[in-house]
A protein has these predicted regions:
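Ferredoxin-type iron-sulfur electron-transfer modules and their immediate structural context
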Residues: 1-154, 202, 241-260, 271, ...
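Beta1-alpha1 glycine-rich phosphate/pyrophosphate-binding loop at the start
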Residues: 49, 58-81, 90-92, 119-127, ...
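A glycine- and small/hydrophobic-rich beta-loop-beta segment
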Residues: 332, 367-371, 375-377, 381-389, ...
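A conserved short coil-to-beta-strand element within the FAD-binding core of flavoproteins
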Residues: 221-235, 373-385, 395-398
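ANL superfamily adenylate-forming
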Residues: 262-274
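Alpha-helix C-terminal capping/helix-to-coil transition sites in glycosyltransferase folds
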Residues: 236-237, 417
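Active-site rim loops that border cofactor/substrate pockets in soluble metabolic enzymes
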Residues: 388-409
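Rossmann-like dinucleotide/flavin-binding elements
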Residues: 157-181, 221-230, 249-250, 271-355, ...
Length: 487
């Protein structure tokens, strides 16, 4: 290699190039010919884009390196690995996320969107690796390691969904005594009562929840804070409180100028519909179902309705009563069941819908018609007060300044016949008994460490702060646990 005697007289920044000069030149000339250049690449330590895109904060590069064999499990005194590489990778993964088998199935994987390999060919199958490691742990009965010392501090976790379970897990690892309070019969929150069971198998969900409880976490189900137990009692009995209430109250259709548009018994919310299905009350629906939404929840509703199908001559009150929680349907004869005609409308065009691309593709593959660029403008009712159709109109929707702007196209209205209309346009928090936390915007206000504003010792996370992904709720719980530990 020949070197020049050229002396670099231009002052360079620490990045080894002139500020403002971002044009890529021939690196070979600079590396091998200029005496002032470095002979090897310069590496800058920064968060990998996959990890930066993961709301749970998983050490993705870490466990992928273990799976690839780059990082080996530690050796024991006998010169053999102290554990299989699968367990080693699982333990690295669960430092942040205690529910990999569930998340490997339902997470839309924003980490894969941020993956560098997208610039070359396609992303690394991070979600599939997570799924595999979660299944391996269940099949081999892997358990979390209990803390060596206990702090003597007690923490109450309100809500047994992903945020509450994540917070309880992290707090238990830190040595705190944790009690989870949940109004339902079983823990899991939206993972159990919001996502269809065929996407989150109950045996898998139960196994991962039980592993958290095995750390010494106590669960008090069928207990609603604010009615069965007051918050004042909790503050007296516990050193800190975490609010993971979730957002399990659905939002009604936004029909302007008609307050009674959604009072028909066959116009329901997505949360009520999915809970009725997951509870086993809902066994079939009407022949024609219209779903209003565009996010992942609306895709769940549409696919469930399509799979449930309808039964000829079934009474409409059958499914209406089941969704309202008044009764359960008899098991329908499979041979008599036919697929429901399901239409999903969204104010956004299909390519701009909020649902994950693969969720949209799955829905279309199941025969669901997706109408992008249509907004609900009215509900057509019959003489009995039941809805017979949803009136929709074409529209143009865009986000401006963080707000949704929808422009209706005049003269484009039409009716979509419907036996059942489901509103899947968002969720709200039920603050019954805890009204003091309602900020008037459908949630509560917390600081960057997820401590509730003006409420020392009270922390929060998950949908109660911002209805979003399960992985976001898990991340909130972990950050709040750190705050509680410091508190």
């Amino acid at each position: 290699m020949s070197l020049t005697t050229e002396v670099q007289d231009t002052k360079l920044s620490f990045r080894r190039f002139k500020d403002g000069d971002t044009k890529v030149k021939r690196w070979q000339d600079s590396i091998f010919q200029a005496s002032w250049s470095h002979k090897c690449p310069t590496y800058i330590q920064s968060t990998p884009p996959c990890q930066g895109s993961c709301p749970s904060g998983e050490d993705i590069r870490g466990y992928l390196n273990i799976v690839r064999g780059i990082e080996k499990p530690p050796m024991g005194a006998d010169g053999k690995p102290v554990m299989p590489w699968q367990e080693y990778a699982w333990r690295r993964l669960t430092e942040a996320n205690p529910l990999p088998a569930v998340m490997g199935r339902v997470c839309p994987a924003p980490c894969e969107t941020g993956c560098n390999r997208n610039q070359v060919e396609d992303h690394v199958g991070i979600n599939s690796v997570e799924h595999f490691l979660g299944e391996y742990a269940i099949q081999n009965n892997l358990q979390f390691k209990k803390p060596e010392k206990l702090t003597g501090k007690k923490v109450a976790v309100i809500g047994g969904g992903p945020a509450g379970l994540s917070a309880a897990y992290q707090l238990a690892l830190k040595g705190h005594a944790v009690t989870i309070f949940d109004e339902h019969e079983f823990l899991g929150g939206m993972m159990r009562y919001g996502i269809p069971g065929y996407r989150t198998p109950r045996d898998v969900l139960d196994a991962e929840i039980q592993r958290i409880l095995n750390l010494g976490v106590v669960a008090r189900t069928k207990t609603r804070i604010g009615t069965d137990v007051t918050l004042a009692q909790l503050r007296e009995d516990f050193d800190a409180v975490f609010l993971g209430l979730g957002a399990q109250a659905g939002r009604s259709l936004p029909i302007e100028g008609d307050k009674n548009a959604t009072d028909a018994p066959n116009v329901v919310t997505a949360t009520a519909f999915l809970k009725a299905f997951n509870d086993g009350r809902l066994r079939h629906v009407g022949k024609r179902v219209v779903v209003v939404g565009g996010g992942d929840t609306s895709m769940d509703v549409a696919t469930v309705a399509r799979r449930l199908g309808h039964i000829t001559d079934a009474k409409p009150t059958d499914w209406e009563g089941a969704i309202a929680g008044k009764m359960a349907q008899d098991v329908a004869d499979v041979s008599a069941r036919q697929g429901a005609e399901v239409v999903l409308t969204s104010v956004f065009t299909t390519d701009k819908m909020l649902a994950s691309k693969h969720e949209i593709e799955h829905a279309q593959a199941e025969g669901i018609e997706i109408m992008g660029g249509w907004m609900p403008v009215g509900v057509v009712k019959g003489a009995d007060g039941r809805a017979t159709a949803l009136k929709v109109a074409q529209c143009e929707a865009k986000m401006a300044g963080g707000k949704l702007e929808i422009k209706q196209i005049a003269g484009s209205e039409k009716d979509l016949p419907a036996d059942l209309i489901v509103s899947a346009i968002g969720q709200a928090v039920d603050f019954t008994g805890l009204e003091e936390f309602d900020n008037g915007k459908g949630g509560l206000t917390a600081d960057r460490n997820y401590q509730v504003q003006n409420k020392p010792g009270v922390f929060a996370g998950g949908d109660v702060i911002r209805p979003h992904l399960l992985t976001t709720a898990i991340g909130h719980g972990a950050i709040a646990a750190d705050g509680i530990d410091q508190y």
